[in-house]
Amino acid sequence: MTDLPDSTRWQLWIVAFGFFMQSLDTTIVNTALPSMAQSLGESPLHMHMVIVSYVLTVAVMLPASGWLADKVGVRNIFFTAIVLFTLGSLFCALSGTLNELLLARALQGVGGAMMVPVGRLTVMKIVPREQYMAAMTFVTLPGQVGPLLGPALGGLLVEYASWHWIFLINIPVGIIGAIATLMLMPNYTMQTRRFDLSGFLLLAVGMAVLTLALDGSKGTGLSPLAITGLVAVGVVALVLYLLHARNNHRALFSLKLFRTRTFSLGLAGSFAGRIGSGMLPFMTPVFLQIGLGFSPFHAGLMMIPMVLGSMGMKRIVVQVVNRFGYRRVLVATTLGLSLVTLLFMTTALLGWYYVLPFVLFLQGMVNSTRFSSMNTLTLKDLPDNLASSGNSLLSMIMQLSMSIGVTIAGLLLGLFGSQHVSVDSGTTQTVFMYTWLSMAFIIALPAFIFARVPNDTHQNVAISRRKRSAQ
């Protein structure tokens, strides 16, 4: 990339900072949740909605981000994304109640949903095709550093300042990024087809109300009648989308995608698999602080081995899949992650705290292998004219399943515990033990889906996508 013009390199730095802001905010909040609960006068059992409100908003808004960038221009949308994310951070820091914090997190999510996909689109437009891979590696590297720094930085700020600072640190970075975007980034636009607003609204309503209904009376305090009504609305919205998308060439996501068996299996496995995996980044720091009495900073440091294991495994995951095939790798890593989850709980309850970093490192390795394998399995056989749509649907499903996973984790805590779980409670570790056992069971379930992957899905096919007609 040394032969790129200086202006292009500055534009890549802007995109990289956007990736860093979004990835840092995804993990920095987790270690602060118990302190937030105490400050806001809420039960820790309700704080999972701080994560759900952000991730669910990202899932809902993702399908619109690419179309908006093509229609309005990448500079305008990227600038808007940074401004919304920064304003959301400010409102989060100023929140005095949980409901205010949830609304502010949703505003952050709107910005976060546009930041990463529009950033990728920007790189595609400003960099020659032969240098695209090197440029994407450069801009995504800060996105890998964010999860590494997030838990420890969040714990440090909570312990030595207050939880408000995990949001306030975004403000100067956001201001600099917004100014740099206006000054340096070109405003590429493209001719766009008509946006499928009806399909977008149907999917948004379906995802949002079903997730809210899943949270149920334990999290939102809704009556059984209200929950039943939400489920009915959500199911009807999704069924209407299926009817809307059938034989509709302008549909948000074409149903032709599901004619590819590996896409259908991979998408179903990714959805179910990330529900289980999505529980772990939320539950681990909460358990370390509330269940074991760790300080926020100590709990944040304990998350670093998991990120290191994940980053290290990415270097060899292709060779592993080529050697053993998708079915074996996905079934083995799914069951392995379930066992590692049980190992973490057992080690923690026995008081072998010095072993926990090694267990979390192993968890990161297994999880990373499974994530990479799920992603490539889902997309590898799609025809070229459906690849972009399939990738967008996968990105949306990834965010949606993570929000559902965190919601289920909060629901499990509510089922097994009282409304006020604290370090001083004698039953706290028992509550977490039952929750962890349930999580291990949920994590293992997608193995039944991955067992249906064709046995010959392996080796060089892992990297290439067959070109064939979508008709």
Swiss-Prot record:
SUPFAM superfamilies: MFS general substrate transporter. Residues 33-48, 98-101, 159-164, 218-224, 284-285, 363-395, 452-471 are cytoplasmic. GO terms for molecular function: transmembrane transporter activity. It is a multi-pass membrane protein. CDD domains: MFS_LmrB_MDR_like (cd17503). It is found in: Cell inner membrane. GO terms for cellular component: plasma membrane. Gene3D superfamilies: MFS general substrate transporter like domains, Multidrug resistance protein D. The chain crosses the membrane at residues 12-32, 49-69, 77-97, 102-124, 138-158, 165-185, 197-217, 225-245, 263-283, 286-306, 342-362, 396-416, 431-451. Belongs to the major facilitator superfamily. TCR/Tet family. HAMAP family: MFS_MdtD. This is Putative multidrug resistance protein MdtD. The lineage of its organism: Bacteria, Pseudomonadati, Pseudomonadota, Gammaproteobacteria, Enterobacterales. The gene is mdtD.
